[in-house]
Amino acid sequence: MTITRHARIDWDEQGNPRSHDFSDVYFSTESGLDETRHVFLVQNDLRRRFTELPVGGRLIVGETGFGTGLNFLCAWQLFDECAPVDARLHFVSVEKYPLSQGDLQRALVLWPELSRFADQLLGQYVAIHEGFQRLVFDNGRVTLTLLIGDALQMLPQLDGQIDAWFLDGFAPAKNPDMWTPELFAELARLSTPSTTIGTFTSTGWVRRSLNAAGFKMKRVPGIGHKWEVLRGAFIAWPEGVTSVPAAKPWFARPTPLAGERKALAIGAGLAGCATAQSLAQRGWQVSLLERHAAPAQEASGNPQGVLYLKLSAHGTALSQLILSGFGHTRRQLERLQRGVEWDACGVLQLTFDDKEAQRQKQLAEAFPESLLHLLDRRAAEVQSGIALNSGGLFYPEGGWVHPPALCHAQIQHANIRLIAHHQALELRRVDDQWQVWSDAQLIDSAPVVVLAGAADIKQFSQSAELPLKRIRGQITSLPQTGASAALRTVVCAEGYVAPARLGEHTLGASFDFNSVDLTPNVADHLGNLTLLQEISADLASRLEAADRPPEQLRGRAAFRCTSPDYLPIVGPLADREAFVQAYAALGKDARQVPDIACPWLDGLYVNSGHGSRGLITAPLCAELIAAWLDNEPLPLPRSVAEACHPNRFALRGLIRGGGK
């Protein structure tokens, strides 16, 4: 994979940014705001369209070339001025060379009238790395999905429909790759007959190429030094051009449900709380069912979880999910109290054997230094504050999180109602509603249910066939000492240890595939102390670990929940028996796609199987659930969403034979 690097900026005497790579300005130095508003807001008729949005309506803007974010901020300012209070703006923008946060801040200082919006953008402009990066503003009223990478690699991965296009990027003569028939075909693929487009260039071949892609473009008067600009609308795919084939039926989007926007999320751990938040921010009324007295009482209840990216150098679906999910979670954490609810202290993964050393070398070659970089032993000791036996790979944006704090923050929304002390045991479909029962008691009902209760969702007949498995894990808590306060970062080898939170260090964690007993045991405490010794004998000594009677150690045990391919299970559920019947032909010839709609269990979704990565994957997967439900652009590449889809297991079973 290619390493995304930041834009190289040259600054003129007035403080205006200029691209070093493309030898072009990011915006007009004479009339930047006026030009942006005229070319993109006026030509797409956004004032009227924002004003006329219906109750709960939304408008989706697509952009080629995020640059300094000026177009986004101007669109947000106009939306804030004239859209209904419950309307939403979703802005999707592709950018090959994102500005660093420092350069972005320096550029946006030039526009003081946008400072209210620019400050919010800068506050969330962290962990911007390769792939799909989602940023959320104003309690979900405004969403920004950045596609970081080459436009012709990123746009084909986007699944969604755009209402208005901002065709930007540097001038065609400076950046011809952004003005090709192939790119215009992608814009057409993502458009509908009501989609509009505006661009600053009036070059004849650009107009003709857009027309050939299915748009109808015309020149209109420009502003400032721009005599003319282009505006247009998507009409239809031209004759002789084949439209993009639909998704395979088992991965197609279910028809959006009409009527009451009410949902039930079952399970108030990380997955359930994040799902409730994502839906509530879109205007859904959400009941969050939890069998315990409060959220985050099981695997999400540990005092410290590590924000650690176990990546692949080969761009796998899991690696893409982790990179996008990490950024999304990291931005959510910016709203929590640092030092108590989370800390961006970094994560150091030690080079504990030759195989790990080779893996780390490959990762360091595949990803930018701002995400991860190698440290030799001496540098690792300086970074961590303790003596070590080796160097390792350092993730400067990582750290630790108090998961219950994140869960509680996610459900602080007027649209979310927590129903505690209720254990959902059965789902029944009655009159387009899902009823949730506990023995003879009807707990609640709604047209939509999201199963977020880890492996416990297998108790429902509708999800019983999902191949989820439990893995018991135990952590150990050790009191901070004067000497252990030197630890400055999370350090991992086979286990992990975190800097102290409220006077206690967390270390762990055990993996037990067989035990179902959640009582902390001495054997696992001893195992965790061994992991600590392997990480750093110096830190073990500082923590006086050898002097602590194992039977007096405090800790906590819970079940992780994972799938056979270690990807989470996220998306709409189908009727398993009807699915096997509908697509039985795949068992004979996997290349033949039956023209049969997927037998969805309308309104039933799952967000589970996050394993030990829930902090990183669950919040973004909640956004994926919301996108499925509300027919929004997906927050992940289509291929990654399909890799996480619940239907993947039944599909593999059919192709391999046996329908399992």
Curated annotation (Swiss-Prot):
Keywords: Cytoplasm, FAD, Flavoprotein, Methyltransferase, Multifunctional enzyme, Oxidoreductase, S-adenosyl-L-methionine, Transferase, tRNA processing. Residues 266-660 are annotated as: FAD-dependent cmnm(5)s(2)U34 oxidoreductase. It comes from the Bacteria. Its cofactor is FAD. It catalyses: 5-aminomethyl-2-thiouridine(34) in tRNA + S-adenosyl-L-methionine = 5-methylaminomethyl-2-thiouridine(34) in tRNA + S-adenosyl-L-homocysteine + H(+). GO terms for molecular function: flavin adenine dinucleotide binding; oxidoreductase activity, acting on the CH-NH group of donors; tRNA (5-methylaminomethyl-2-thiouridylate)(34)-methyltransferase activity. In the N-terminal section; belongs to the methyltransferase superfamily. tRNA (mnm(5)s(2)U34)-methyltransferase family. In the C-terminal section; belongs to the DAO family. This is tRNA 5-methylaminomethyl-2-thiouridine biosynthesis bifunctional protein MnmC. The lineage of its organism: Bacteria, Pseudomonadati, Pseudomonadota, Gammaproteobacteria, Pseudomonadales.
